[in-house]
Structure formats: C-alpha cells, structure tokens
Amino acid sequence: PPKWEKQEPNNCGPTSLAMYLRYYGWEGDQATIASLIKPKEEDRNVNVEELDYYVRNRVGWLNFQYRVGGDIEILKKFLAAGLPVMIEESFNMDQSYWPNDDRWAAHYQLLTGYDDAREIFTGQDSFVGPDQKIPYDKLDEYWQSFNRVYIVVYPLDKEETVKSIMGPHWDKDYNRQHALLAAESDIQANPENPYAWFNLGTNLVYFDRYLEAADAYDKAIEIGLPQRFLRYQFGPFMAYFHSGQLDNLFALTDYALERTKNSEEALLWRGWANYRQGKLNEAIADFQQALQENPNYSDAQYALNFVYGNP
C-alpha cells in the first residue's frame, strides 16, 4: 500500500486521492490536491467530479474512471489485477455538532486488498488509520448511500485491463441503466430504504427523467435522510429545477444551507431558482457567494456569465 496520510479536517477526498496517486509514484500530498479543488479548508465536500477534474488536469499520465451501481465482485476484480479502487460511503462521526445531531457524514475509502476466506477488504482510511479490515457486508451497507460509486485511477497502459474488468460497464449509459435497475431491486427488497429511493432519483437524473427523479427524491425525503445528506449529493436540486418545482427547490436549498452554510452547490441552485423567478439581484448574490466559498467553482462562474449575458 502507499504511504498512509492523516487527513486534515473535511479533507478525506484529497487525502484518499493523494494516497491513491502515490501508489503510482506521484509525489504530492493532500494539500497539493486541495489547493486546486478545495482551496478553503471550511469546504466540507469534494465530489467525485472534482477529483476527476484534478487527475485529468494535473496528472496527465494517469487516467480516471468512475462508475456507479458497483458490487463486491467488481471491487475484487480490480484489486486482483493490482489496481486499488476508491469508493464513497457513509461515515459515523464520534462527536455531535448541534443538538440531536445524527452524526452521519460522507467519507472516501481507498481499498488496497481483500481476503476472500475471511470476506474482508483492506482499506487505507484517511481518518481512522492504515490497513483497516472491512467486512464485505458492512462495506456494501455503507456504500449503498452513494449509489455504490467506485473510482479507478490507472496508468494509460492499463486501459485494456480496466476495460475488460468493466465489460459492458465501460459504456456509461449501460452502467447507469444497470444502477437504475439495482436501485429498483433495492426498493423491492426494502421499500422503506431512503438510499434506494435516492439512488433511483440520481440515476433517473442522469437520463434527464427529472419528473420521475423528483418523485423518487420526494419518497427518500419523506422516509428520512441523514441531516447532512445534501452536503454531498445534489441530484434533488437538479430534478426540482428542471421539473419546475421551485418551491421544493427553495425549501431544500434553504435546509441544506441551514446545515452547511457555505455549501457552494446549494447556493448555486438557490441562485438558479431565484433566476427562474426573475429575481436577478438575489440570483447574482447567490452565485457570487458560491464563488466566494469556492473560487474555483466553474459552475458558479458559468452561472454569473450566463446571467450577465442574458439580463
């Protein structure tokens, strides 16, 4: 395994990616990565697309692929081929930050090995420590809340290996359709599982099926999601915006900002809701604040350019 690194606050994404890249001889650390995609320490979320952006723009000799709807078998196949794999999952914090805090958060985990006889993965956990032993069933339970996303970073000469392991999942549309069906079967297994409904919504958003996605998200919210969930996943903002459900969008972005006042994604989508209602000054203020929270947030820069270009 690569040399383990202890994460700074809210920095599991850059730290896990740094350990991953060091596996291939890269010479940087979490600060190198965070300086581009998370310039402010208070930024509590780094999403998969931001990690992808870093590798593609700063580490051109490695490639980055991510897919959803994964399973234990595909993780093992990558590891057996000598390729570590990174996932995003649930995490239980050991302290509360407000009254009745459910202490739920998101976390990245870098998997570097497995033992089939004992049914455990080995993970390099930037918060807990190196060489953590994680039972297969526990991993799947924690992984489900993030649509079972998996990330593979690899040298360009390993592309054929990665393609053969992914098989039809190399095609992103096929992969999403598979994840959509997996979410539906999770719902059948337990109709009261909010993550299954949320994943269904997210996979529907991928196919621009916004009205159906909004219904699935409604169900997830009605059953009950963790308090910080919208700090990390933004599909509902898109579904409500594109299906014209602005009241829901305002309610949800306000709730997200109550929990995470510097969430650039919630600010962005509240800005778009304001724009759709013709409140240009409020929209511009939201977009500017989003950019202030993350000066490298290109979606907010795009939004400002769009509004200034279409007053």
Would you name each region that the model predicts?
Residues 284-311:
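Terminal, low-structured helical/coil segments at or just beyond the last alpha-helical repeat
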Residues 98, 102-103, 112-207, 212, ...:
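Noncatalytic regulatory segments and standalone regulatory/sensor domains
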Residues 202-211, 218-273:
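Alpha-helical adaptor scaffolds
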Residues 69-124:
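Active-site-adjacent substructure of cysteine-protease-like catalytic cores
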Residues 1-74, 80-81, 146-173, 192-193, ...:
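Cysteine-nucleophile protease catalytic domains, especially the papain-like/related folds used
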